[in-house]
Amino acid sequence: MNILPNPRRQPWAPNARGIDTLATDARGSMARGSMARNLAIWASTFLVIALLSLPAMAQNHLLIETESFEDKGGWVIDQQSFVVMNSSYIMAHGMGRPVKDAVTTVKFPKTGKYHLWVRTKDWAPFPKGPGKFQVILDGKSTGQTFGESGSDAWKWYDGGVIDIKNATTKLALKDLTGFNGRCDALLFTDDLKFTPPNELEALTAFRRKLLNLTDKPQDAGRYDLVVVGGGIAGTCAAISAARMGLTVALIQDRPVLGGNNSSEVRVHLMGDVDKNHYPKLGRIVREMDNGDPGNGNPDAKEYGDARKISIVKAEKNISLFLNTHVFKVEKENDIITAVVGRDIATNQERRFSGSFFSDCTGDGTVGFLAGADFRMGRESKAETGESLAADKSDDFTLGTSNLWASVDRDTVSSFPETPWAMQFSDEYHIDEPKSDWQWETGFGNFNTITQAEQIRDHNLRAIYGNWSYLKKNKAAKYGKKELAWVAYIGGKRESRRIIGDYVLNQMDIQEGKFYPDGSVTATWTIDLHFPDAKNSKYFEGQEFFAGTKHIKVAPYTIPYRCLYSKNIQNLFMAGRNIRTTHGAFGSTRVMRTCGMMGEVVGFASYIANKYKTSPRGVYKDHLPELTGILKGETLAPQP
């Protein structure tokens, strides 16, 4: 396989000693200089003062994106809020233990006075949160503590005027608590009166200018199929298409594959692959399967990250792009021509063009950006005729989990007080040493896409608050237990469902209807989550613990027509963002089932490429050939 790295170099990017900068003097002439390391982008703009013959005054802005620090120490990159921030950030995720400093080197063009601005937030202002950190320059604190302002809005905080004595300076972020302090960027400016913008549109333009991000990203190539989303569905789609001889780009916004089944989220695979109407479907899912380590296993290796990547690496037709968030779609009329992604660490942008695209993001990101019709939330009974539908349509969705686990130690340990977290009591607390699927937030009171950060933070407040209570009040049981792992990447269940040519519903599932284009065989119960009644009693409107009622079903097939967009002509879907009703979604959403959807998409994309037709054209004109592949009657071409 051709793994394409995400290099730090760009045409405009720095070499090991500095970066090319562009300055315009008062006469409009251009001068280039080499003035900083690869983590700081200088934008030098000269303001022409039209007062008599006064000379031009120079302003130098040094923007440092924290996700690009050379050594992130114990801080982690979080891209989950890219859709509302247009940026990633780093976070001190230490589970109550301060993490190692994040460190980088900055090269200033001159010594002297600079105004420091720090973009951060107080993530748990109840009344003040625990995410405190300091900015360190050459081993000395700048004198302020950030992350405890009492405001949960992302904005620039005034760090005061700093006297830079060394042109080459070591910059560090020092975590003070281990409780998820976070920082998006730092700005040094020699215009001591300048205030950076906070409004998103202006901030995005400001950021793009200083990072020299143009409208011409690096060309990442053209592919037969571009798969966006490297969860189980997307990875299986990429492998399936590659084994049919197609060139494939697989784009994933995290450093690992597997999505909810990766070590970052740790949800086990569910759904059967051995009850298939087409028994040979599911072979790739079996390759990816790591058995059943359960949910939230403290041993990361149990989720097989390395094996998943090694399987993809073995496919010479796949070009893998990790750490790449797709944020833009290019199209002509109703046909996607390319997607653009940004590296979540280096901010390098790449353009991926292709004949066909598969949205395996879970959130339906590609479809949404392309203008595909979609649905989010519950339909009404009047709309669907389903007994499980809501009386009135609403925004209710299944929630997001941040799983956690503790381990036994030889000695007693303590845990900090957490006045900013959810508060528990003898009357109500959750007496367990690790989580399972029930730890879940987002039942319509949070938007699972635009409020992903708030959902995760709400889950963290529940986890840390409950653990603090257990350590203090049940010492006999929990005294020697220690938090070993808490997920900072949310395991999302439901968001957008892209509308296809068919909408699978509750009756299709319970009546076992079989359609001519039935493809994936699904077996999971109709499993719709709702807030646990006792949790609602004590945390009404702030629930973080779920209940469910499993409705058993016989094996049924999902029509191929659910796996492509109704109004975007070259867009496939696989995973939880296919078009079903909310009720049917309760059964189709589990990962082995989603992986088989990916396999079908890979086969269908082969036929679409072969005949230069659309995903719909595969259904209308070539369904027997697709069925033959599903049955194993049609051999894959030799790559």
Predicted regions and their residues:
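N-terminal secretory signal peptides that target proteins for export/translocation
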Residues: 1-38
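Beta1/beta-strand and adjacent pyrophosphate-binding region of the FAD-binding site
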Residues: 219-231
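N-terminal Rossmann-fold NAD(P) dinucleotide-binding loop
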Residues: 234
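Extracytoplasmic
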Residues: 59-218
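Conserved N-terminal/central alpha/beta ligand/cofactor-binding core
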Residues: 246-247, 252-332, 375, 398-405
